[in-house]
Design a protein with these regions (language model features):
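A short amphipathic helical element positioned immediately N-terminal to and/or at the very start
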Residues: 113-121
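Hydrophobic/aromatic residues within the transmembrane alpha-helices of Major Facilitator Superfamily
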Residues: 14, 18, 51-52, 88, ...
Length: 206
């Protein structure tokens, strides 16, 4: 793959990654509710989920999703319900220690990682959209597999960098409010963002 083709794809990936969607909303929710460490774990989970999703898309899953309304809706609703459930738990679970630093402060890093890994994998639009843009950068006269690997790695890395920026910004903003009442409301807001992200996934249409 020529450098100018790769660079064009990297820039396209960055523009896509910067647009806030359900994935970014869930990362911000974790940052506001549980702090930087948990937010960064959710970023790692999203990166793994994105990598799996785009790999599946290049392996043919996009064709199934594009032609099967049932498969599309199963992925969509599974991701939506999961995020909404996590958000409601975050809103209702306010009796834990009010701190952004320990595991008791909210979600555990492992649960944030697994949650966003599922969000990445269960987001059907990621699969369909990646196929739409990657097709513009794969040359049929060159071996397919090396090009596909480069695109998957590039997209995942660029999206992870963008998500990290969102996580650090949101967690830093949340730390500006240190009173117990402020932290309670920040956590509720974080849970609300997760619920909103789930609702956003539920409204996706083919």
């Amino acid at each position: 793959m020529e450098f100018n083709v790769w660079l064009a794809f990297a820039i396209s990936s960055l523009l896509i990654a910067l647009i806030p969607g359900p994935g970014v909303a869930s990362i911000i929710g974790f940052a506001m509710h549980s702090g930087k460490r948990v937010a960064l774990a959710s970023v790692m989970g999203m990166a793994v989920g994105n990598a799996l999703a785009v790999t599946l898309s290049l392996a043919g899953a996009a064709t199934i999703l594009a032609t099967s309304a049932l498969a599309f809706n199963i992925l969509k609703w599974a991701g939506a319900f999961y995020l909404i459930a996590i958000g409601l738990v975050a809103i209702l679970k306010n009796e834990q220690a009010l701190s952004f630093d320990g595991a008791a402060s909210g979600a555990l890093p492992r649960s944030a990682f697994l949650t966003n890994m599922l969000v990445g994998v269960l987001h059907p639009k990621t699969i369909l959209f990646f196929v739409a843009i990657s097709a513009q950068f794969i040359r049929p006269d060159q071996p397919y597999l090396p090009q596909a690997v480069i695109l998957v790695i590039t997209f995942t890395a660029v999206a992870a960098a963008s998500d990290t920026a969102y996580a650090l910004t949101a967690s830093r903003a949340a730390r500006l409010f240190r009173s117990e009442q402020s932290i309670r409301w920040i956590r509720r807001a974080g849970g609300g963002v997760l619920v909103t992200a789930g609702c956003a996934i539920a409204t996706i249409q083919k």
